[in-house]
Amino acid sequence: ILEKYPLAASCGRVCVRFCESACRRQTVDGAVGIKMLKRFVADQAYPLAEGVFPKNLTPPANANKKRVAVIGAGPAGVTCAYHLLLNGVAVEVFEAQQTSGGMASVGIPSYRLPKDVLKAETEGVIKRLGGKVHYGKRLGQDISVDGLLARGFDSVFLAFGCSKGGMLGIQNETPTPKGYSSGIDFLLDVHKHVECGEPFSLEGEVVVVGGGNVA
């Protein structure tokens, strides 16, 4: 599993299992429970909290002398950094938020995806493989592609997400009234309050429009 991607424990908890609905094993008795199998392996044979990493995946010490900056510490950025580090590339990850995991750390509640599991598979894996993670570094504000290249990085991988809330598109819709917010923006505000201590308050009755995961 780890030869492909480093997020087995996280995916084993929150994956929506599209592959299982198309699994040909259903014609015999039932789909292969790949989601739970990955979670079991990750939880039992891959002790995240102990910092143990399979010997066959130990990276060479900056074997090719290359340096790569990865913008974004979500699943895409972490997976990119993971494979680069395993191939001996020096990697530094720059994340706008104060924690790794991308929207998974903001939009998925802890009872479904524990924060320590996500942190271990993102920041933890990168650091164990010799990479660095910088928080509070927003592209276009704190860092730039040209600036990173000028600092000696050979390449820059852009892995920032699209964490911007959408509107309903109804008549007279405007985000200006007090208390009006998209679901994504609301989750981001709550996350910043809980994790970073930024001010946030919620008063009165609340109406949630929608019935999906964000809602």
Task: Describe the role of every protein-language-model region.
Residues 90, 130-132, 179:
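Conserved beta-strand segments of alpha/beta enzyme cores
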Residues 18-44:
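Iron-sulfur (Fe-S) cluster-binding segments and ferredoxin-like electron-carrier domains
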Residues 156-159, 182, 208:
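Redox-cofactor binding/interface segments in oxidoreductases and associated redox assembly factors
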